[in-house]
């Protein structure tokens, strides 16, 4: 049994090479053809056309007859009609109807519930019908098949491109979901920022308590210093009194010594006079005078002993006062040292908390700016993608309309359905992207509302947005308007700095110059010594 390709080759060798016209009319009975045919070349639904056998049969003629194809391009549509009529004639011929099952025929195949009529391509049929019109019609149909092939490949490339865009949009969707998760993480960081703020507030309260305790201890220290000054004054008075008493005692001692010497001289003179003129004065008078002198001497000794005892007591009191003063001074120095250490620890703790709060605020601002920048970039990308998709959809629609007007085959309907399905998928992706954009904007607004908190260093409020709850707690409209004006002015200034690089450069230079000037003043400042 001959193969189909051999039969077509024999028909090609026996058929003449001349072509007269591509618009020859062939009388045939038109029969109904199936809408979709699975060809061997494509493997997908296509118009009801001969597959590889007819392509092999007409390939050489098509390669040698491009000039004929260009010459008959103006009558391409009638040639297509004539080709369809010629194939109807072939299907209605007696050789096809009377073909036996064991001959070289293509059996009927079921494609989607439809059957394709088998045709006989043997040498007998080629010998009976080998007119040039039939060849020209085959050439026209082959050209139409090649055009459809190119269009189908182009549509497949577009479909692959749309699929790639779809996967890219899906990846962007996943990226947006990850960004939403990152925003949730940033909200957790904001919770930690709130905790740091509460810890800073507690530290400030503890600092205030420590300052109050320090003031109380300072008052105690002042009282102790006053007591020390009073004791020092008492000690000075005691020393002065002791010196005065010493002077008086020395004077009294000198006087007593003089009196005693005078008395002794008097006694000696009396004794000498007693031996000379004992008869002149009585003895009892002399004895009375001696006793009187002895009594005075005893009184003087008693006064001297009492003065010495007073001096000893004053010395002991002075030593006790000095010991008390030393104890008070040591206690005062210990209290001062402990208070200074506590103050240094509180200052270091508050400085660390302030640094943490400032770092958190800077990170929050940077995160907000980064999110805004990414949102703007994503918005611009989404707009570009939407414009490209709209343009592509419009191009596809226009081409689909052109193809629908140009093509009369039923195979284009399936491609149209496929393109419409892809268009619907693209529209769904666009709607999903719009929904994601709306969610992103809402999340950004919510994040802006949550992150605009007042972090004040040394009781100075931070920048607050117009949606901050502090503004809603202010009942005075003038104060609220003033705060809103300051907030909007700061926001405009920041937006101007963000949009103008020269303004940012000027601000940075101004910032550096001001800090250098401040450091110069701090380093060269010498306080006046009065």
Swiss-Prot record:
Q: Where is the composition biased (Polar residues)?
A: 69-91
Q: Where in the cell is the protein located?
A: Golgi apparatus membrane
Q: Which UniProt keywords apply?
A: Coiled coil, Golgi apparatus, Membrane, Transmembrane, Transmembrane helix
Main location group: Golgi
> In this UniProt entry, which cysteines form S-S bonds?
none
One Pfam annotation reads Golgin_A5
Q: Which GO terms describe its cellular component?
A: Golgi apparatus; Golgi cisterna; Golgi membrane
Low complexity bias (residue ranges): 457-472
Membrane recorded as keyword: yes
Give residue ranges on the Cytoplasmic side: 1-504
Write down what this protein is called: Golgin-84
Provide the membrane topology annotation.
Answer: Single-pass type IV membrane protein
**Where is the stretch described as Disordered?**
1-26, 41-116, 368-388, 453-477
Q: Where is the composition biased (Basic and acidic residues)?
A: 94-107
Q: Name one GO molecular function term.
A: protein homodimerization activity
The parts of the chain that form a coiled coil are 163-446
Which parts of the sequence lie on the Lumenal side of the lipid bilayer? 526-530
Record's function text? May be involved in maintaining Golgi structure and in intra-Golgi transport.
Gene name of the record = golg-5
Instruction: Supply the InterPro entries for this chain.
Output: Golgin_subfamily_A_member_5
Residues that span the membrane, as ranges: 505-525
Q: Which domain of life is it from?
A: Eukaryota
- GO biological process annotation, one example: retrograde transport, vesicle recycling within Golgi
